[in-house]
A protein has these predicted regions:
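Compositionally biased terminal segments of proteins
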Residues: 2-166
Length: 166
């Protein structure tokens, strides 16, 4: 969301990622995150894996949530990473570039395109019904359409919504 709408500091409680070509198990995810957290970077931030758990927002949304703690003494911040596999990205993922906060460089990640993000948000609203939908889903739909609606390819959005609701 942040990269799509240009809000680099969008408040969020977690990170979401979809992986390809990987069997999603607690053991494998725990091993990978422990390895990543052990990487030393000269920024005084230390990450600690607190645990892993299954997540199922619906039966069609299996995944694993990794609970982490980011330590930058004296600050300690909890965060989570929700990991899924097999999500349909229509037509394909795209590359986003992020500027580092404390370093004069960028990193690139493959991420959902605008139409797939909108399709997933719309599907969440429709499947949960109005009484159970999270306010941030409505906000995300509004902000995506308000800021990037003119760039949204309607045919791609339709295909993405069809694939998301299969």
């Amino acid at each position: 969301m942040s990269a799509i709408v240009g809000l680099d500091t969008r408040a969020t409680m977690d990170l979401d990622t979809t992986i390809k070509g990987f069997t999603l198990t607690h053991e494998a995810v725990l091993s990978i995150f422990k390895d990543v957290c052990a990487v030393q970077i000269d920024d005084d931030v230390q990450f600690e894996v607190m645990g892993v758990a299954d997540i199922r927002e619906t039966d069609d949304y299996p995944g694993i949530r990794v609970s982490l703690k980011a330590n930058y003494p004296p600050i300690s911040v909890p965060l989570t990473v929700d990991i899924t596999t097999g999500d349909m990205i229509t037509p394909r993922e795209i590359e986003y570039t992020f500027s580092m906060l404390f370093d004069d460089r960028t990193i690139s990640v493959l991420a959902y395109n605008l139409e797939t993000v909108l399709a997933e948000k719309l599907e969440a609203v429709l499947s949960r019904n109005i009484a159970n939908t999270r306010p941030r889903d409505y906000y995300d739909i509004y902000i995506l359409y308000a800021l990037r609606g003119a760039e949204c390819d309607k045919a791609t959005l339709r295909r993405a919504l069809e694939r998301t609701t299969e």
